[in-house]
């Protein structure tokens, strides 16, 4: 039985990472794919837990060998989702979450037309700016650049299947769970899981 592929994207400051981690921790048979990146680890990040931290040479070898479902360059660093991190899980019937941007969604959807894409929105522009300012002692120019990048990401919201507003964390988390559960209840997926029951009922 094949699992479902979920893509979750959001502007920086929308709370995407916390939401997808909570989703993966609260539901059975769903995993969060861990991306490869060439950027150095930030304080508190662990290799193999937050990202697979690799050199440019390793990344290029993987890319050249067709090892990525999607890859992109962001602020001078490279990010990619390895096929080996996703395909075996799907084949086992596990659902997989990809935490990527709109560009990555386009690449993945070209290969998996039936994947489910979700975009996380902040509740307001003011809240988004406030969250971005909380990330560090940045200059006004840096905050303005981050806001510009966030708005550019948001402009692609209409390429996604679902929109979830992260104002109240628990409400947004419940919304994400509902999307996953609705996918699991689709007839085509349930037919496989309930094959013996259906056979018995239709004898």
From Swiss-Prot:
It is an enzyme of class 2 (transferase). Keywords: ATP-binding, Cytoplasm, Kinase, Nucleotide-binding, Transferase. ATP binds at residues 10-17. Its EC number is 2.7.4.8. It is found in: Cytoplasm. It catalyses: GMP + ATP = GDP + ADP. One of its GO terms (molecular function) is ATP binding. One of its GO terms (cellular component) is cytosol. InterPro entries: GK/Ca_channel_bsu (IPR008145), Guanylate_kin-like_dom (IPR008144), Guanylate_kinase (IPR017665), Guanylate_kinase_CS (IPR020590), P-loop_NTPase (IPR027417). It comes from the Bacteria. Residues 3-181 form the Guanylate kinase-like domain. Belongs to the guanylate kinase family. Essential for recycling GMP and indirectly, cGMP. This is Guanylate kinase. It comes from Nitrosococcus oceani (strain ATCC 19707 / BCRC 17464 / JCM 30415 / NCIMB 11848 / C-107).
């Amino acid at each position: 039985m094949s699992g479902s592929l979920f893509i979750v994207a959001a502007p920086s400051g929308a709370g995407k990472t916390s939401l997808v981690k909570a989703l993966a921790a609260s539901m059975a048979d769903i995993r969060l794919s861990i991306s490869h990146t060439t950027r150095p680890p930030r304080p508190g990040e662990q290799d193999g837990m937050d990202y697979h931290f690799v050199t440019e040479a390793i990344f290029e070898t993987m890319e050249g060998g067709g090892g990525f479902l999607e890859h992109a360059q962001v602020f001078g660093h490279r990010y990619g989702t390895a096929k080996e991190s996703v395909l075996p899980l799907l084949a086992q019937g596990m659902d997989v979450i990809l935490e990527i941007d709109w560009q990555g969604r386009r690449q993945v959807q070209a290969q998996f037309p039936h994947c489910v894409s979700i975009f996380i929105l902040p509740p307001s522009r003011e809240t988004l700016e406030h969250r971005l300012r909380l990330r560090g002692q940045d200059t006004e120019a840096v905050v303005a650049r981050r806001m510009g990048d966030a708005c550019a990401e948001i402009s692609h919201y209409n390429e996604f299947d679902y929109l979830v507003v992260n104002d109240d964390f628990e409400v947004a988390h419940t919304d994400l769970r509902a999307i996953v559960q609705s996918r699991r209840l689709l007839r085509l997926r349930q037919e496989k899981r309930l094959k013996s029951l259906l056979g018995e009922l239709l004898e």
